A protein has these predicted regions:
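Aromatic/acidic, Gly/Pro-rich catalytic loop(s) in extracytoplasmic/lumenal soluble domains
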Residues: 6, 467-538
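Membrane-proximal, lumen/periplasm-facing interface regions of secretory-pathway glyco-
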Residues: 350-357, 379-434, 442-458, 480, ...
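Short acidic/glycine- and proline-prone juxtamembrane loop motifs at membrane-interface regions
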Residues: 164-174
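Membrane-interface transmembrane helices that cradle and orient dolichyl/undecaprenyl
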Residues: 182-200, 375
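Hydrophobic/aromatic-rich transmembrane helices and adjacent perimembrane loops
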Residues: 326, 330, 334, 351-386
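Short helix- or helix-capping micro-motifs
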Residues: 57, 151-160, 205, 209
Length: 538
């Protein structure tokens, strides 16, 4: 027997508790109430699920910033690269990545300073914004709060989103945000058909394109899917759609021009696709298809499995006879199918044989929403399944919290160890024999030095306009790792600089009891000997 003590507030979540009688536990009932609150109720004027997500992101910004400040640690690989490049606004930054994430980092740093706080605001602002846009789009299409919550928390079932994007990755997180914003903008076009809606759709299209270049797959798939449905085709053929096209082109034009004039920088990472590594055309195609299937399973396998198990757990619940899905659901399924087809064609036509799991993000970002919409038509069985998805997504997000805090302080192995270096000590040793305005290294770990001196110029071998960016006095700083140094030596020479004959080795402390306790760094002053040679500007 169970007795309820206290109440349940729809504004502030579960406030009562259950009293144990006859030795029976009530944890399950309490968790079900909490899940229902996340799905259907409000926290003040906001949906409870949205409030949970926003609070989660705020907590992450505060805890990660304060813990790093307390420990004196730096940032990991991807965010140290942002520290290096976000010093200036530019149409492009190299590394085969579009500039939008860096623009946001630059803007935030101009408001709160070049700091860990700035980068965490960008990261978790994008995560919260993307999840909120995703939720809102599903609701605007007429589906239930429960479906919208299941779609939003369903995104957190992807390990690449709930885990990898919290301790690494930058531009992939921009895909989550701006693909969701584009989804919402399309919904607004279909609902309102106003000039403002079409203009915002153009801006959202540009933002999605400038988040990461492989997001063109999502753009193309969503466009073709909209053309394939009678209910959405009319909005695309509306002459006001030209407003969207013009706005998108104008917003992307500076980066498009930069890309065409910096093709070498744009394609600098193209060897990562493993093009034509199979030898013959048939072998290459086989490797490509196998790699694609493996990437699909690694990326989407877990969320699909969780949705399937959640559905099986609700199998005893009643459900009406199956009916064809409404047009919004058809739109999403078709977008996913077209994205898969486009990806397969690119693999076969381009001879791609190597994949990273996160490259599947533009293909499957609409999958949780499509599944949540399907469940909305399944009565009590669908409601139960949606609740399970919300519960699992929320629990996974909370379980990740302490691990993400650990990674923020300790980093990983190999390159990730740069987090634990004492950059204040390194900066003091760099400037012990005179001021330094530019630090050059073979890769972007040295971007962390801008946490100590925001005015410092930090360059690596992939920075465009390398020669023009150097401000004297300049030093070359090389770490005791296995990174090749020949490229940076070549760029220094072409920029008209020579290395001093004196190479100073300094021991940089590693924090938090790391072993070995220090890392060896070689510091060499650079001297101007000639003007930059042809080709040194890029």
């Amino acid at each position: 027997m169970l007795d309820r003590v206290g109440g349940f507030s729809t504004k502030h979540g579960p406030t009562g508790h259950w009293r144990i009688r006859d030795g029976k536990t009530t944890s399950l009932q309490y968790l079900e109430k909490w899940t229902d609150w996340l799905c259907d109720d409000k926290a003040g004027p906001f949906n409870a699920g949205l409030a949970f997500v926003v609070l989660y992101c705020v907590v992450q910004v505060v805890v990660m910033t304060l813990s790093s400040h307390w420990a004196g640690t730096g940032l990991g690989v991807d965010e140290s690269e942002q520290l290096m490049v976000m010093r200036v606004l530019a149409a492009g930054y190299g590394s085969s990545q579009p500039p939008l994430y860096t623009w946001l980092a630059h803007l935030t740093a101009s408001l709160v300073g070049t700091s860990i706080l700035a980068l965490k605001i960008v990261k978790y602002g994008l995560l919260a914004g993307g999840l909120a846009a995703y939720f809102t789009a599903v609701r605007r299409l007429g589906f239930s709060n429960r479906a919208a919550a299941a779609a939003m928390f369903g995104l957190l079932l992807f390990p690449q989103i709930v885990w990898e994007m919290q301790h690494a990755l930058t531009h992939s997180l921009a895909i989550v945000c701006f693909s969701s914003v584009l989804f919402l903008a399309l919904v607004e076009v279909l609902k309102r058909r106003s000039v403002a809606a079409y203009a915002l759709f153009g801006l959202a299209t540009a933002a999605a394109m400038l988040s990461k270049y492989n997001n063109v797959i999502f753009l193309a798939a969503l466009f073709v899917a909209a053309l394939s449905l009678r209910e959405t085709r009319e909005a695309i053929f509306d002459r006001r759609f030209l407003i969207s096209v013009v706005v998108a082109i104008l917003a992307c034009l500076p980066t498009l021009h930069w890309s065409l004039t910096h093709l070498e920088d744009l394609l600098s990472h193209s060897d990562g696709f493993g093009v034509a590594e199979g030898g013959s055309a048939a072998a290459t195609a086989s490797l490509g298809v196998f790699g694609l299937v493996k990437a699909i399973l690694n990326f989407a396998g877990l969320p699909i499995a969780i949705f399937a198990v959640a559905f099986l757990l609700a199998i005893r619940k009643s459900a009406p006879p199956s009916q064809p899905g409404p047009w919004p659901e058809k739109l999403l399924w078709r977008a996913i199918a077209f994205a898969l087809l486009i990806t397969l064609l690119l693999v076969l036509a381009g001879g791609v044989t190597q994949f990273r799991d996160r490259w599947m993000l533009p293909v499957f970002i609409l999958l949780p929403a499509a599944l949540a919409m399907r469940l909305d038509a399944m009565g009590d069985r669908g409601r139960k399944t949606q609740g399970t998805i919300v519960f699992v997504g929320a629990v996974l997000a909370m379980l990740v919290l302490p691990v993400s805090w650990y990674m923020q302080l300790y980093g990983g192995e190999n390159r990730g160890r740069i987090v634990r270096m004492d950059y204040h000590s390194l900066y003091s040793q760099l400037t012990s024999d005179g001021p330094v305005r530019t630090v050059i290294s073979s890769w972007f770990w040295a971007g962390n030095l801008r946490l100590v001196d925001p005015d410092l110029v930090v360059l690596d071998d992939e920075i465009p306009e390398f020669a023009q960016s150097i401000r004297e006095p300049a030093v070359l700083v090389l770490m005791d790792d296995q990174e090749p140094n020949s490229v940076i030596f070549d760029r220094i020479t072409k920029a008209g600089y020579a290395m001093d004959t004196i190479h100073r080795r300094v021991a940089v402390p590693q924090l938090l009891g790391s072993m070995p306790p220090t890392r060896q760094v070689t510091v060499t002053r650079l001297k101007k000997v000639a003007g930059p040679t042809a080709g040194a500007t890029q």
